[in-house]
Every structure is written in C-alpha cells, then in structure tokens.
Amino acid sequence: MAEAPIAPVVLVILDGWGYRPDTRANAIAQANTPIMDSLIAAYPNTLVNTSGKDVGLPKGQMGNSEVGHLNLGAGRVVPQELVRISDAIEDGTFFDNQALIEVCQRVRDRRGKLHLIGLCSDGGVHSHIDHLLGLIDLAKLQGISQLCIHAITDGRDTPTNEGAHFVQQIQAHLEKIGLGRIVSVSGRYYALDRDRRWDRVEKAYRVMTEDGVGDGRSAAQVIKDYYASDITDEFIPPTRIGAGAIASGDGVIFYNFRPDRARQLCYALVNPSFDGFPRERIQPLDFVTFTQYDPALPVVVAFEPQNLNNILGEIISRQGMKQFRTAETEKYPHVTYFFNGGLEQPFAGEDRELIQSPMVSTYDKAPQMSAKAVTDAVCRAMEKGIYSLVVVNYANPDMVGHTGKLKEAIQAIETVDLNLGRLLASAAKVGGTVLITADHGNAEYMSDESGNPWTAHTTNPVPFILVEGEGRKIPGHGGEVKLREGGKLADIAPTILDILQLPVPAEMTGKTLIDQPLVEIKANRTPVNLSR
C-alpha cells in the first residue's frame, strides 16, 4: 500500500510586503487583495519586526532580503556584516586586517595602483560609505601612492538623486588626506546586475579596465549633468572621470559586504573561465573582497563568513525529511544561499527550482514578473506529496516597489494576491499548513511626504499569517491557535519546527510565535507525517 502524501509546511515569503496603516502612497493598502484580506480576517495573524537590532543590524537600519532570509533560515538574530565591519573600523582592528594590509603592501612594492570598487551610499544594504572612507584612511596609512575610486551610485537603497552628494563627500575626504581620485562612476543598474545581463556589466567593466581620460568634469558634476537629463543614480551610464584603469600589477578591494550583486563584476575581473563577454584577463591582479562572494572565486576574503550551525534546512535534512525551494531569478539566491546561512550547496533531500525572471530593463514594465510560473512550481511540488517543508519567494512587491511606480506596484501586489489564492487552494488539497510572511517592507511606502518616489526598503513590520490545513490542528497547542505579538523573523524557523513537532536546538534563540496553551498538553514530539 502506497504511503499517504505528506502534508507540508509551506513558508511563503512576500518579498517587500510591509505593513503601514496610512494608505497614502501605499500600494498594498490601495490594491485589491481579496485573498490576503480574507486570510487576515479568518486566520491567526500578527506582525513581526524585520529591521534594526531585531535582525542583527544597527538600530533604525532598514532590513533587506539577504538579512531577512538569513534570519528566517537561521532561527536566530544573525549579526550582520554591516555591523561587524563598522565595529572593526571603530575599534581599530580594521586597520590590522591581514588581507587588507597584504594587498596594500604588494601594490606598494610593485608601485601599482590600488582600486576601491563598491556602492557609494549610506544605504547599508550592500555597502556603506563609511567603509570606503575607512579604506581610504587605510591606504594612506599603508603608504599607497596611487589610489583610484570606482564609484557605483545607488538610488535604490537611498533616494534617487543623492549620488552627487556622496561623491562630494568622498572627494572631500580624498582632498583632506591628500591621496586618491575618483576615476569612474557607474549606476548600480550596470555594475551590480545579478541576473546575468552581461551587456550591462560589460559597460561597467570596460570603463574600469580600459585606458581613457575624462572630459575635465568632476564626478559630482557628471552626475548632476545626468540628473538634468532625468537620469537618476541607479541608471547612470558607466562614465570615465579620469585616468586610472585597472591594469596588470594593480590591486583591487571590492568593499560591498553583500555578495549577490557584487558577484558578476567579480567574475568578469578575476574568473579565469569567464565567458559572459569577450575580455582579456588582467594578470597579476591582487583582489580582495570584503566578504565571501563565491567560494570558487580566486580572491582573498577580508572578513571570513560566520558559521551557522543547526539552521532550519539542516535540521529538516538531518531528520530524513525532504524540502523544496523555489523563486524567480531575482530572489533565488535568497531562498537557497541566504536561507541556508551562506551555503551554496543544497542539503541532502533539498530540491530547488529556479524560475527565470522576465528580461526587462525595469520591473515596472512587467509587474506580474514570473509569479505564475513560481506558483506552478510550488503547486507541482506539493502535489508530489514528498516534501515536509516548502519555501517560496514572490519577488513582485520588492522588485516593482524599487521602481517607485505606484500604479505598477499595485499591479504587482494584485498579481501576488491572485497567485497566493492558487497556492492556498493547492495546499488545501494535500492538507498543508501555510505560513505567510515577508522579509522586509517596501511596497507599502512608494513616495515620501513631498511626493518624491521612494525606492528603498522601510523599517515597517510585516505580516505573519498561519493557515492551518483543513481538519488539522497544531500539535501540542489544543484548540484555537493564537499568535503572540512582538515577534521577529528569527522566530519563524522555531515556529515551523513547532508545527512539525521537531525539537528546537539551543542555537536557535528565536521563540515560536504560537502562544503556549495555559494548560500544558503532553505531546508526542516525535516527527509525524501530517497526512490526511
């Protein structure tokens, strides 16, 4: 007799779906969302925090997808690289970092140039300008004679036209210490693509590596001139400011601390088997990255990764259970690499399906993105009846929210709501329990008080909804399930283990969001098959 299909726990991550009571510029509140509205009216729900110290960031710092998925998968507050590096600068250990000192020494001995590449803003999502200023000070202390800055402008995790201000801040610091120059600028749309759009990356690569000089304008003036043509920070074309191309014998420090958007440019610069576009590999080239972008890259890492043990995916695997992860291209690393604590390889029994994102310049041109295909993949996985845990990310609220286009963001929200209905119907057929949440806010705040487009994340909380499978009750919790208030993303993995009747390891300092019953109920904590 065939085994009954497994009724999975399905974790649905609505990327960028925050909660904000004010409906002004709120794509979520203004959208027609009958599915989410009915869930909030009928099922246990609460709000969880996704920013600041609740996710391992500085107080008041907005969360992001990497941080959110790390905390979701780890079941604990994970200290973030932003804090780790900032603390090192503050306590002085940054200036003793062996990887940074050695690249400076080799460049100095060869009388080469030291190049600093990274996102120039205080957004704190992929980088921080204070880290660049710290590197400039380090170069001065180490006796570097030629320092070249390749500035990547933001406009996504910061307001759309602050790039000129940031490069002026950098230029002032260079002049103050008497070292260095900004030699190129490029919008992150080009230099930090993560969807294998190599034509974009190539433009940034050429400006950084091919000889040339500017036209005499400063970096700030170049950026301001682009503003006058309605080109904002994210989309500034790669532009040469002055002499200082990356060449044989030079050294590079890539100071983004978040890997996903730094990888492709790194591949082009150092990967011997790179084939994204024609280029001659620059050798020798000493290359340091702030954090580990990819274990296969031939680079030196300044801040080695933190090891996270007993995370959710590992526990599920160790129990002999199968799990499934899916998302479209833009968020695929988040449900795999980041959810697994920075591990590239899947755990035993972990299956993955990558859905291609639409090939458009910006996602306001396709607000539906690939939500339908993502839902199809989830439904197929659940129907197999073999997975105890399913993790899915819907990218639409975040990726369309980043465009600052309210009308299109509303369409994105309505697309996700429609597909959520399909997912829930499929889960109901197999008795699955569905947990719906988000990794951070975004689409609930599309413009500031002055009406200017807001393209960054927010510090708002996000919903958490628990939809029990029909006829199912959460083991060990008696009758009606109630969720507690004041939770955070780190509490969701312990909640999943609670539902699956698996013990929560000591490393998981998060606490289940399910309120404990007043009367203790003795429950069999042996893993169970939640089949019908």
Swiss-Prot record:
Which GO MF term does the entry hold, naming one? Answer: manganese ion binding
Which gene holds the coding sequence for this protein? gpmI
Family to which the UniProt record says this protein belongs: Belongs to the BPG-independent phosphoglycerate mutase family.
- Binding annotation for Mn(2+) 1: D398, H402, H457
Record's InterPro entries? Alkaline_phosphatase_core_sf, BPG-indep_PGM_N, Metalloenzyme, PGAM_B_sf, Pgm_bpd_ind
Kindly indicate whether the keyword Iron-sulfur belongs to this entry: no
Residues binding Mn(2+) 2, per UniProt: D15, S65, D439, H440
Q: Which cofactor does it need?
A: Mn(2+)
* GO process annotations (BP): carbohydrate metabolic process; glucose catabolic process; glycolytic process
Which HAMAP family is this protein grouped with? GpmI (MF_01038)
Keyword Isomerase annotated: yes
Q: Which reaction does it catalyse?
A: (2R)-2-phosphoglycerate = (2R)-3-phosphoglycerate
Q: What does this protein do?
A: Catalyzes the interconversion of 2-phosphoglycerate and 3-phosphoglycerate.
User: What does UniProt give as the signal peptide span?
Assistant: none
Name under which the protein is recorded:
2,3-bisphosphoglycerate-independent phosphoglycerate mutase
Which EC number(s) are documented for this chain?
A: 5.4.2.12
